[in-house]
Amino acid sequence: MVAPSLPHSNRLSFDDGVALQEHFHAQGWTDGLPIVPPTTDAVAACLDWAALPADHLIGVEPVRGRAITAEKVAINSVMAGCLPSHFPVVVTAVTAMLAEPFLLHGATASTGGCGVLVVVNGPIRHEIGMSSGFNAVGPSDRASTCIGRAVRLVLGNLLEVRPGEIDRSTLGHPGKISFCIAEDEEQTPWASLAAERIGDPYVSAVTVMAAMGPRQLMNEWTTEPAEILDTFVAEIKANMRHYSIWAGNYAVVIPPQLRAHFDTAGWSKADVREYVFEHARIRRGEWAGVGKRSAVGEKGEHTYAALTEPDDLLVIAAGGPAGGFGAVIPPWLGTTSRAITVPVGACIDC
């Protein structure tokens, strides 16, 4: 196998900040929002924080063979507004996306319009000021917003994942600008997502998932875990009818008010996953009721599950303290892309 050639960065100079912004916009290097100038010092600060040389190869995009270096990721992290302390999380998210089971090219080139959900676990959440509470799935804090945005800028500027170029999304969704969540590990007896997926409850880690936009739900009328989960299941089944029937990595976000009912009843994350696995199923014939009769064919009585196994479900503890709300985050296209979890500082192919 021929080693990929490493990209080199050009040094640019501008008369003023307005000229810089307009040049970056004109080149298609932004997401439509203003960027932070990626000065030599700012980029070097990110690299120094992570102890990475500029030409360190973070990975190679498996389909197109594009080499992604630490310097290129640092440039886009600075542009997104990241501090140097945020940079290791961005590097880890990029590392996870480059894993072959994630199918980065397919997910980012599809007309389906998915974004990249980034979930952060471990001590680094507090070290960089991430919030797991109010507005957890929206703009909640600087670190979450900038890390999610950095991931998008990396895709656009290093892999041409821009609308009308590699990105062929028919609609897309707002999470494609930034979609980063820190899990609430303190206000729950549940094991963290990272602890469940890599077996270490103390490590800082990042999980990435090719995800559609969140579907918010509410159930304040029961304290029974099964009834609460029936609402989540109904949302998953609606996605199977309206969008994609194929099983994959669904994520559910459960805030404190609902989590308290699970805690009182002694339900673990494993119990949640098992219940959803058993109940989130539809018959193909149900497509007839949502205008897809011609796609039913002779498989009307065939049953499809949302998950291939219980562990396909990502259960994320996050959200503000009040309100019986939750969210289902559907996968892009079933098992075509798999969620990937990587410890901060790890290298998949080393």
PLM regions with names:
Residues 1-350:
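Non-transmembrane, aqueous-exposed alpha-helical and coiled segments at domain scale
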